[in-house]
């Protein structure tokens, strides 16, 4: 049951296990949460001894229908346009292939194969490209290209891929393995173990699901010392490394993995075309 008040909306809820009634006050951005008498909600936060909980822009969270898992990608896409995110999820339309899309997909798959094998030498990478190309033959024809042209383009990307791996795929952080967080803090980082590839993660706590490119173990060194963390690793290709949807998606994946593994951090590899 909901009851509007001057500075928010009050939900009278029944806790599933204890059958006790409690009150949740929704304020600010949470005020318009479309709760109905039959809604299931999950509260991430604390209740007072009298059974009161205030949810606003700074305190606590409410997940509406957490049993209906929504793709983290769909949620992230909604930051740009709510309608677009819904339409993309419901209408599985396909657009014409283009060269950046093809090269981005190939780079994504090549990176994953190299990460799985922990092998970054030129011979292995070229052999992997040769194995990937037959599966992209129709797309190559659609963009009026040839396998030879596509392979040459991918060969031009190998030096920077190998340079990145030399710096970051190591047992211990190197002096040049510097990463900068969004708050400006700097750390040294190394990827020292691959835990999973294309990991499917479901989180009824947050009502989210996701398919994470790779889950890796990293070592971080900063002013607080050395830490070993389990992190989601997302391979992003495109023109805009500050894309709001990319940032939102990686933040949501961080939530998903924190639910499974505990405290984690986040990193992403970006390639521009």
Regions found by a protein language model. Give the residues of each.
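Hydrophobic (often cysteine-bearing) scaffold residues that line and stabilize catalytic clefts
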Residues: 99, 103, 107, 153, ...
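Flexible glycine-rich surface loops and low-complexity tracts that mediate binding to linear polymers
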Residues: 33-57
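Short, amphipathic alpha-helical segments that act as regulatory/interfacial helices
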Residues: 104, 108-115, 254, 258
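Mg2+/Mn2+-dependent nuclease catalytic core
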Residues: 6-41, 189-273
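Conserved structural-core and active-site-/substrate-pathway-adjacent residues in large, well-folded domains
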Residues: 81, 107-108, 214, 253
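Extended, charge-rich, solvent-exposed interface segments
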Residues: 52-103, 109
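A non-catalytic, helix-rich entry segment at domain boundaries
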Residues: 110-195
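Accessory interdomain/linker segments of ATP-dependent helicases and helicase-like nucleic-acid enzymes
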Residues: 1-9, 151-154, 158
């Amino acid at each position: 049951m909901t009851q509007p008040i001057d500075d928010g909306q009050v939900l009278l809820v029944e806790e599933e296990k204890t059958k006790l009634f409690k009150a949740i006050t929704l304020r600010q951005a949470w005020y318009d949460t479309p709760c109905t008498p039959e809604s299931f909600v999950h509260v991430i936060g604390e209740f007072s001894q009298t059974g009161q909980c205030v949810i606003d822009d700074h305190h606590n969270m409410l997940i509406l229908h957490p049993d209906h898992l929504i793709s983290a990608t769909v949620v992230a896409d909604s930051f740009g346009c709510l309608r677009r995110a819904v339409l993309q999820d419901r209408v599985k339309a396909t657009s014409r292939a283009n060269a950046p899309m093809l090269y981005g997909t190939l780079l994504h798959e090549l990176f994953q194969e190299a990460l799985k094998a922990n092998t970054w030498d030129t011979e292995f990478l070229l052999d992997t490209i040769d194995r990937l190309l037959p599966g992209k033959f129709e797309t190559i024809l659609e963009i009026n290209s040839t396998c030879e042209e596509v392979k040459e383009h991918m060969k031009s990307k190998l030096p920077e891929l190998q340079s990145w791996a030399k710096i970051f795929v190591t047992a211990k952080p190197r002096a040049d393995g510097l990463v900068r967080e969004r708050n400006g803090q700097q750390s040294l980082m190394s990827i020292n173990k691959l835990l999973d590839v294309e990991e499917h993660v479901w989180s009824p706590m947050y009502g989210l699901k996701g398919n994470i490119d790779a889950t890796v173990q990293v070592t971080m060194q900063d002013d607080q010392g050395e830490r070993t963390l389990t992190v989601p690793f997302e391979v992003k290709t495109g023109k805009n490394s500050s894309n709001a949807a990319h940032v939102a998606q990686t933040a949501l994946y961080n939530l998903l993995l924190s639910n499974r593994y505990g405290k984690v951090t986040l990193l992403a590899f970006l390639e521009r075309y």
